């Protein structure tokens, strides 16, 4: 079942494009990009989510990340 979002694809894509431009400007490697993304997620959880909800939301975030990864097709 697809997950519905309260945010439009346009909103998400616009912000994603702006972030991508900043990372490109700084020639951020994939490793640095993932480190930055992880730090952003950690900061959001620690600063904007109630302590009682952090673990649950982090687990849901991790599950969503894992489910969004493309798996290589085997023949």
Swiss-Prot record:
HAMAP family: UPF0352. It holds the Pfam family DUF1414. Coiled coil: none annotated. This is UPF0352 protein VP2129. Belongs to the UPF0352 family. It comes from Vibrio parahaemolyticus serotype O3:K6 (strain RIMD 2210633).
């Amino acid at each position: 079942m697809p997950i519905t979002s309260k945010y439009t694809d346009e909103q998400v894509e616009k912000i994603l494009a702006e972030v991508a431009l900043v990372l490109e400007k700084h020639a951020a490697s994939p490793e640095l990009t993932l480190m930055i993304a992880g730090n952003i997620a950690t900061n959001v959880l620690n600063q904007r989510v109630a302590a009682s909800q952090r673990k649950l939301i982090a687990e849901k975030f991790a599950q969503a990340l894992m489910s969004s990864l493309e798996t290589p097709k085997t023949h």
